[in-house]
């Protein structure tokens, strides 16, 4: 999707559920639901430049409007970014464009810094560059709070822009993406070297990193089905990365990891974020026809499926306890099973009727 990537295992045409529910950013939700593994990365993931970090590019989990999308609605964006590119000196704030989305949502409780940000943005309906609004950390923190509250919109370089530069996504004109890619490529790492030689190189780097994160999420979901921990999987992935960084001599050890069975990729960025493109992972991917609208179409035609489980325990020989709101004891297993099934049937019929069922 645009903001997240969700991975689920399908068995007999249904997603597998679990009592502990989904896993979001490595944390179990502890709510009985589909066992989905979710990572905050997608076509609209915000790419942030971190000049003092070992890794100067951070991708996700927050989102931003892709430059190609924002430029279609706000023509001044390309003009602003082009002026930044024409300067000989790069700034950390280059390539970030902001506008007011919904000032009404936050009328009270604003700090002075937030008031100042909204006042500046209010003077330009189409939006302004980050540098023109805030040049210090206090102002940038205020902007981040307003973005989080949905008051201020942000556009910056995203994987969607990278896909447009490389020609794997052709939905929008690439002008804004190309300028944004050049601005990002000329930023410096902590050693003073440009991040990339040009916009093509930075775009390829961004998409490769996103594909790797998608692949690792798929592997995590597969490992979870095999009752392997993320720690065990991470050791293999760590060794694979270390080997990939070795240069100057051939590798004697071949490290390959993948998934048994096919992986179906759906969502608008499926083709551009397919993790099997470079052959690094042993994953057999399938991209269905109309994959771009599969999520929306599935939601529109999807059926409602309700499930209930009732536990029957045996505290001692010959005693069978059916665990409902109030546990009931039986001395015959078949009678206990029959009662449990009848209780579940009545509950499901009632809930399906409330959900709109007409023949429950």
Which residues are covered by each model-predicted region?
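N-terminally biased helix-coil "hinge/interface" segments that flank
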Residues: 1-360
């Amino acid at each position: 999707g645009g903001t997240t990537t969700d991975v689920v295992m399908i068995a007999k045409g249904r997603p597998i559920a679990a009592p502990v529910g989904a896993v979001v950013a490595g944390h179990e939700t502890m709510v009985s639901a589909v066992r989905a593994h979710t990572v905050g990365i997608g076509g609209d993931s915000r790419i942030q430049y971190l000049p003092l970090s070992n890794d100067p590019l951070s991708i996700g989990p927050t989102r931003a409007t892709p430059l190609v999308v924002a430029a279609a609605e706000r023509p001044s964006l390309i003009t602003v970014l082009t002026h930044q590119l024409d300067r000989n000196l790069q700034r950390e704030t280059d390539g970030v464009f902001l506008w007011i989305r919904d000032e009404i949502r936050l009328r009270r409780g604003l700090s002075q810094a937030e008031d100042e940000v909204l006042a500046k943005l209010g003077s330009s309906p189409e939006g302004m560059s980050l540098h023109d609004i805030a040049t210090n950390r206090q102002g940038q923190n205020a902007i981040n709070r307003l973005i989080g509250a949905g008051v201020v919109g942000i556009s910056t370089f995203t994987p969607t822009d990278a896909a447009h530069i490389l020609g794997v996504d052709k939905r929008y004109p690439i002008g804004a993406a190309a300028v944004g890619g050049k601005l990002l490529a000329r930023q410096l790492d902590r050693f003073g070297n440009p991040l990339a030689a040009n916009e093509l190189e930075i775009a390829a780097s961004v998409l490769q990193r996103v594909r790797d994160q998608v692949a690792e999420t798929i592997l995590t979901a597969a490992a979870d089905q095999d009752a392997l921990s993320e720690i065990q999987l991470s050791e293999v992935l760590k060794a694979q990365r270390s080997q990939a960084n070795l240069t100057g001599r051939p590798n004697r050890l071949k490290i390959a990891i993948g998934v048994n069975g096919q992986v179906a990729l759906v969502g608008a960025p499926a083709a551009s974020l397919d993790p099997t493109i470079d052959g690094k992972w042993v994953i057999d991917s399938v991209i269905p026809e109309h994959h771009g609208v599969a999520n929306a179409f599935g939601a529109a035609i999807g059926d409602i499926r309700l499930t209930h489980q009732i536990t029957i325990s045996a505290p001692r020989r010959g005693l069978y306890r059916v665990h409902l709101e109030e546990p009931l004891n039986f001395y015959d297993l078949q009678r206990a099973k029959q009662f449990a099934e009848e209780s579940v049937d009545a509950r499901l019929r009632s809930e399906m009727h409330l959900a709109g069922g007409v023949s429950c």
